[in-house]
């Protein structure tokens, strides 16, 4: 575990899925203008970089971009990170009939929504640690649908 305040580096590879046939989850994050929204993005990026999930673009889902819609509908488990109670990520997915396997509303971790302020990197590191712990203790399940048997890349 990282002990430096604000250190967003994930723990070593022990957090990556352990079952080789389990599909890598897709993670979508809020990217609004508040401090809470901006905190969600680096958490999603760290999940991507450590291999716990593959980040994709929620704006592309909202914009009906075909390639990104194909990824969202691939049948892989989805992690939604919403910065505030407006739950824009969850709502954008729901507009397309997509339910995340795991939804994290960052206010549940004490993240406050503040306009015109930067997020606290130490708080982002704590949120990352809690999300990784949750994913470790309650792994996501899911498999690609029959129509989409091969793994799609989530990068947008």
State where each predicted segment sits.
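A general structural motif
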Residues: 58-62
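Iron-sulfur (Fe-S) cluster-binding modules
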Residues: 1-57, 67, 72-77, 87-156
């Amino acid at each position: 575990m990282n002990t430096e305040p604000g250190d967003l580096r994930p723990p070593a590879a022990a957090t990556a899925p352990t079952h080789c046939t389990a599909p890598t989850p897709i993670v979508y994050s809020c990217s609004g203008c508040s401090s809470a929204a901006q905190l969600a993005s680096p958490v999603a990026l760290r999940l991507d970089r450590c291999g716990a999930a593959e980040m994709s673009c929620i704006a592309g889902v909202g914009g009906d971009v075909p390639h990104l819609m194909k990824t969202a509908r691939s049948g892989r488990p989805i992690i939604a990170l919403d910065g505030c109670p407006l739950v824009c990520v969850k709502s954008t997915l729901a507009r397309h009939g997509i339910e995340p396997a795991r939804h994290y509303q960052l206010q549940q971790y004490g993240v406050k929504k503040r306009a015109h302020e930067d997020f606290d990197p130490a708080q982002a590191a704590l949120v990352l640690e809690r999300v990784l712990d949750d994913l470790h203790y309650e792994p996501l399940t899911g498999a690609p649908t029959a129509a989409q048997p091969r793994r799609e890349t989530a990068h947008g």
